[in-house]
């Protein structure tokens, strides 16, 4: 009787010891971009779009700013309602201009 009880206790201890707690889930880190860096990115985006669309930078409107895990995107349009997207890397360096 004691042997059955002892064996069942040992099995229970062994099973409890085998269960591992799952590692905590990692959340993506959201780095904040400074306002001055955002303004620099906007000016660079406007300059690139103005050159591409052969117009002045003052006729370019940036309408949206999105942050992704490893990049940034700025959306905008010209006074003729031509849309574009400027892409930047995680450091804020200009990557490319996409016409939409």
Curated annotation (Swiss-Prot):
Q: Does the keyword Nucleotide-binding apply?
A: no
Keyword entries, A-Z: Cell membrane, Lipoprotein, Membrane, Palmitate, Signal
What cellular component GO annotations does this protein have? plasma membrane
Query: Known InterPro entries for this protein?
Result: YsaB-like
Membrane-topology annotation of the record: Lipid-anchor
Q: Lipidation annotated as N-palmitoyl cysteine: which positions?
A: 18
Q: Where in the cell is it found?
A: Cell membrane
The leader peptide range reads 1-17
Q: Where is the lipid attached (S-diacylglycerol cysteine)?
A: 18
One of the Pfam families matching this protein, by short name:
YsaB
- Name this protein carries in UniProt: Uncharacterized lipoprotein YsaB
Name the gene.
ysaB
């Amino acid at each position: 009787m004691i042997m059955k009880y002892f064996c069942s206790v040992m099995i229970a201890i062994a099973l409890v010891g085998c269960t591992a707690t799952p590692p905590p889930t990692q959340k993506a880190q959201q780095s904040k971009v400074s306002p001055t860096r955002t303004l620099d990115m906007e000016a660079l985006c406007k300059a690139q779009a103005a050159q591409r669309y052969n117009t002045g930078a003052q006729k370019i409107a940036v309408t949206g700013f999105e942050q992704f895990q490893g990049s940034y995107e700025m959306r905008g349009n010209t006074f003729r309602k031509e849309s574009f997207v400027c892409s930047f890397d995680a450091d804020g360096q200009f990557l490319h201009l996409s016409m939409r």
